[in-house]
Amino acid sequence: MAIMHIRTRFAPSPTGFIHLGNLRSALYPWAFARHNKGDFILRIEDTDLERSSQEAVDVIIEGMAWLGMDIDEGPIYQMQRIDRYRAVIKEMVEAGLAYPCYMSEDELNKLRDQQMANKEKPRYNGLWRPEPGKDLPPIPEGVLPVIRFKNPIGGSVIWNDAVKGQIEISNDELDDLVIARPDGTPTYNFCVVVDDLDMKITHVIRGDDHVNNTPRQINIMKALGGSPPVYAHLPTVLNDLGEKMSKRNGAMSVRDYQKAGYLPDAILNYLARLGWSHGDAEVFTKEQFVDWFELDSLGRSPAQHNPEKLLWLNHQYIQNADAAKLAEACKPFAHQLGIDTENGPNFIQVVGLLKDRANTLIEIAEGAKLFYATAPNLTKDQITENISEAIVPALKDLIEALKNADGTKESYSAAFKQVLAQHQIKMPALAMPVRYALFATTQTPAIDAVLVVLGKEEAINRLSKVVV
């Protein structure tokens, strides 16, 4: 028996805004394709001309590339396939699978109003549906028809959803779907079916807001002689207030997270856990995620966005990152703050010093400003307030001890220990005034590590100014 070659797709509408919930809908089909050594296709559903733009498509592609979600085929644009859709519609009409409907919008609205008044489900009544022995109304002059699909009468549509289990929808609940508008433009549900058939999609992994579209798509697919793919409908992603995540509800875009100093691997790790799990694993690599990913590990309950958890994850990734790679990622943020990373202390060393405390790349850049700023020009009042006369002798001895240091963290630590023992004082009593003398602040990483980055000569020069 031949092994199925897995083909999945992500098919967004290019509206110019892509949030974490959107990206999760891309991540799972991407991971499933990669896990099974299959193909991942990017399809752009851009038939809504008023809302679609190339700039919006670029936002999607950039967001996926930033997270490392590579594509095998695409982007494929639906608007470039219009001729294909029209050809299939023509074939369906000729085969009796679809038909022109001349019911006007006004007539349709009146029908719906009447049905609702009778407490019936609003639906098309099949007026123009051709049946053996049925007389159709006369075709009105000057009216362009829509094309409707002849939905099966009786029976049910049944599919075994990989997330939700077996779902059954009666055909009596479905009316004859419009598959082409009066101007010939094909509609969403029809285009999706033709695309999935042409692209040989084996697994459709998407949000559960598409569940109601699925029976219609299955019926059209079967009418065209195709076999439905495996469907996996993902529960909704809720924002931190329990509402559906959307731009309207204040969701941040992917670009917002980039600008806020989040690492792509942290975002990907976080997205993976929004509806999927592998035991108790919280922090894992992209490679581990792909290796572990299975559809039967997807959750059935809505996932809720937790900004604090995302920030915690970002901290974990920053803390464990290689300092050189992290420095490259930090440079744009440092440059925005006016830091010249090529002049002054070694930027990789600075980042290595700051990364254990930082939650974002912005925090690292903010911390780095200390090391690239000119020496603080402290006033007499500032010195008096922050550096007591009693500690000055210890500071003078520290300057002498530092002159013998060899620039290593260990040698600086030894210099401090020597002075602490000599003056019978505790580390905070000496470290706090040293920090203030060096940077005009008492909040810095470990002082011996700070001295490695700042450099012995610069440290001695700054300390000398406060003990004159």
From Swiss-Prot:
GO terms for cellular component: cytosol. The keyword Protein biosynthesis applies. This is Glutamate--tRNA ligase. Its main location: cytoplasm. Keywords: Aminoacyl-tRNA synthetase, ATP-binding, Cytoplasm, Ligase, Nucleotide-binding, Protein biosynthesis. ATP binds at residue 247. It is found in: Cytoplasm. Catalyzes the attachment of glutamate to tRNA(Glu) in a two-step reaction: glutamate is first activated by ATP to form Glu-AMP and then transferred to the acceptor end of tRNA(Glu). It is an enzyme of class 6 (ligase). GO terms for molecular function: ATP binding; glutamate-tRNA ligase activity; tRNA binding; zinc ion binding. A motif ('HIGH' region) lies at residues 12-22. A motif ('KMSKS' region) lies at residues 244-248.
